[in-house]
Amino acid sequence: MEALFCSEIPNNNIRSSINDLSSSSSYTWPMIMTSSSSSSSSPTIMNIENIPRCDWDLSLSAVVSSASTGSDAIGAIEFDPTGEIIATGGIARKIRSYRLSSLLESRDDHVTASESYICTPAKLSSLKWRPDFSGRVIGSGDYDGVVTEYDVEKQVPVSERDEHGGRRIWSVDYTLYNGSLIGASGSDDGTVQMWDPRNGGTLEETVRPGGGAAICSVEFDPFGGSSIAVGCADRNAYVYDIRRLVDPLIVLDGHTKTVTYARFMDSHTIVTGSTDGSLKQWDIDNGRRVVRTYRGHVNSRNFVGLSVWRHGGLVVSGSENNQVFVYDKRWEEPVWVCGLGHTNRFGSDRRFVSSVCLRQVDEDWCTLVAGGSDGALEIFSGKQS
C-alpha cells in the first residue's frame, strides 16, 4: 500500500514508514463534567457553554469500497459547485466521479457506483473544480509536477501545465476575482505558481514563501477576497494579497512541523493543519493571533485531509488511527469521532484516513465524505440536533 506522505524538515524527504494504526467505532467526545462538590453521584453540567457538544446527528449513510487490487489511497475529494457530484483522485491514477443522491439511496456497498472515471498518466495529489464551467471541468495536480484540466463529461484532457520542473504538485485551486479567473498550484519545488486558465495557462506570478521548502497547500479566499493562504514545509503558513505578491501579508508561525493545510473558515479566519498533530484557528485581521488549537486526532507524517464547513462552523480532520475527527470551531476538543473500517482490505493496523471533504451548499444538513488509504469512501450525513 502506498500512502500520501508529507514533506519533512529540513530536507523535504518523503518518510518511508507508517505508524501502527488502529480503528474504532463511532463515539462522541465526553461532554459532561462531574462536580466534586456534589453530594450526589449524578453528573452535573457545569458551564455548559464551555463544554464541547455535537449539534449534528451524524451517521453513516453510504460506503464505496475500492475495486482495485493495488494501492488506491485517496488523496483528494471534491464536491462540484452544485454539491451533487463527488470527484476523487489518488494513487490509483484515476479521477472517479459519483452522484451523491445515488449513493444515498441505500446503505449497500456501492463498489461499482462510479458515474465515470478518467485514467490519468500519474498519481494524483489534488483536485479542484474550475468555477467558470459549472462542474464540467476539473483541475488535477500530480506526482509528475503537471496540472491537467479534464472535461469530466467527455472524459478527456483539455489543458496541461508542466511548470514545476517535474516536482510533485501537492495542491491546486482556482478563484474568480473581479471577473478574472486565476489558477494556483503548490509544489515540492518550493513555489506557488499562479496562471490564467483562460489564456492557455500563461504563467502570471511565482512566489517562493518558504525559501525552497515544499508547498503543501494553496487556497484562495472562497468569499471573493484577494487573499491566498499557503501551507509550507518550513512549519509556517503564509497569507498573500494576490494584487501584490512581493511579500506575504502575514506569516503564521505557531506550528512545530510541516503545515500540510491552510483553509479559510471566513475571510478573517484561517484554519491550519500540521504533522505536529494539531489544527490551529487564526484571526488574520489581528496579525497572527491563534484563537484556538485543536487536538485529538493523530497526525505525524501523512496527509490526512482537512475540511471546514463554513455554514455550520465545523472543522474536520482525518487521522492516522483510521478515524475521522469533527471539531466545532468554538472548542478545542473534538465533538464527534468515528472510525472507518467497513472494508477490511489491508487490515486495521495499516489503514488511515487520507482525505476528507464537507459539502458546502447546505445550511441545515451536514454531509461529510472521508476517504481512506485503502481506497474506500464513507459518507456521513445528518441534520442539526
UniProtKB/Swiss-Prot annotation:
GO cellular component terms listed in the entry, alphabetical order: Cul4-RING E3 ubiquitin ligase complex; cytosol; nucleus
Subcellular location field: Nucleus; Cytoplasm, Cytosol
WD repeats mapped onto the chain: 69-108, 119-160, 163-205, 210-250, 254-292, 298-337, 348-385
Paired cysteines (S-S): none
Null allele phenotype: No visible phenotype under normal growth conditions. The UV-B responsiveness of the double mutant dhu1-1 rup1-1 is similar to that of the single mutants dhu1-1 and rup1-1.
GO biological process: flower development; regulation of protein-containing complex assembly; response to far red light; response to red light; response to UV-B
InterPro entries named among the record's database cross-references: RUP1/2, WD40/YVTN_repeat-like_dom_sf, WD40_repeat_dom_sf, WD40_rpt
Domain of life of the native organism: Eukaryota
Alphabetical list of Pfam families matching this protein: WD40
Main localization of the protein described in the UniProt heading: nucleus
Keywords in alphabetical order: Cytoplasm, Flowering, Nucleus, Repeat, WD repeat
Matches recorded under SUPFAM superfamilies: WD40 repeat-like (SSF50978)
Induction remark: Circadian-regulation. Expression increases during the dark phase with a peak at the beginning of the light phase and then decreases to reach the lowest expression at the end of the light phase. Induced by UV-B.
Subunit structure: Interacts with UVR8. Interacts directly with DHU1.
PANTHER family the UniProt entry points to: WD REPEAT-CONTAINING PROTEIN RUP1 (PTHR45389:SF1)
Function statement: Functions in association with RUP2 as repressor of UV-B-induced photomorphogenesis mediated by UVR8 and HY5, likely in coordination with DHU1. Plays a crucial negative feedback regulatory role downstream of UVR8-COP1 to inhibit UVR8 function, balance UV-B-specific responses and ensure normal plant growth. Is involved in the regulation of photoperiodic flowering and vegetative development.
Misc. remarks from the entry: Overexpression of RUP1 confers an early flowering phenotype.
Protein name as annotated: WD repeat-containing protein RUP1
Organism annotation: Arabidopsis thaliana (Mouse-ear cress)
Record gene name: RUP1
